A protein has these predicted regions:
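Ser/Thr/Gly-rich flexible loops in soluble cytosolic domains mediating phosphotransfer, phosphorylation
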Residues: 3, 72-100
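Short, charged N-terminal beta->alpha structural module
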Residues: 2-33
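N-terminal beta-loop-helix "entrance" segment that forms/cooperates
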Residues: 25-51
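Short acidic, S/G/P-rich loop/turn micro-motifs used as interaction or catalytic elements
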Residues: 12, 59-62, 82-83
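Short glycine-rich or small-residue beta-strand-to-loop segments that form or flank ligand, phosphate
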Residues: 3-9, 53-56, 76-77
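Short, structured coil segments at secondary-structure junctions
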Residues: 24, 70-73
């Protein structure tokens, strides 16, 4: 199955994106980054084998914990509120971009 890695601040965002991705044949692996904590840390192997990485955080990419894991991977950024309110559009946009 095609994997998308999602880095987010809460499980609501991850679950909504995961549901939509599953409908389209993609699997979402996610970790929660809140403050200085990482919950459900994703391995470097999973990150490197993913089709894409999606950051849905209310902070800049430079402030992500252990950012070195994400060097040289295809990534996307979206506001958490957009991901929660329109998860289908977010996932469809990523898949469309990957297929181009």
């Amino acid at each position: 199955m095609n994997n998308i890695v999602v880095i987010c601040e809460n499980t609501e965002c991850a679950n909504k994106l995961g549901e939509e991705a599953n409908k389209l044949g993609y699997n979402v692996k996610f970790e929660i980054q809140k403050g200085n904590n990482i919950i459900g840390k994703i391995s470097i192997e999973d990150i490197k084998s993913a089709k894409a990485v999606l950051f849905t955080l209310n902070r800049s990419i430079e402030d992500i914990q252990e950012i070195e894991r994400f060097i040289d991977v295809e990534y996307y950024e979206v506001e958490p509120s957009i991901a929660i309110n329109n998860p289908d559009e977010v996932i469809k946009d990523i898949i469309a971009d990957l297929n181009n």
